[in-house]
């Protein structure tokens, strides 16, 4: 049996009827996480900021993290894996899914590369568009707005600044304003992952 986990952006790009047809046609079983990884990751950031000093960069977007590292080494990178990676680790370790292939779809190539480098047992990461191409299925247009827009950290009781898009990130981290923030939310794609190279 082959299990398929669909990231939230891609899930918005396919109707329930089309998904059901795709799963049946290709003998795939959709799987979801049992844990609420978004809430768990948010709690990890809260705990980090409660116990550490200085300014941290949100580490959910590896492309943005790479950019910040190259431009402003004084900004600390949170040692917290992206939500998608947390989900994949759960699926790779779950006894009820043991010894079966798990396909984890991603909204971008860099997240797929990050996941595959972990070499999780029976688990393969692939951008949504490449997954569909590999099984000969057409891709619907990406949504106009991200299901995970900037603002993930808005309820944390710390100074949080949100930046999306390379120009905005570059401008912010090469200035001095970042020193006033405790956490910088970073999304390399403007306004969210719906602009990722894995869903376009």
Task: Describe each PLM feature range.
Residues 1-200:
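Iron-sulfur-associated redox domains of electron-transfer enzymes in respiratory
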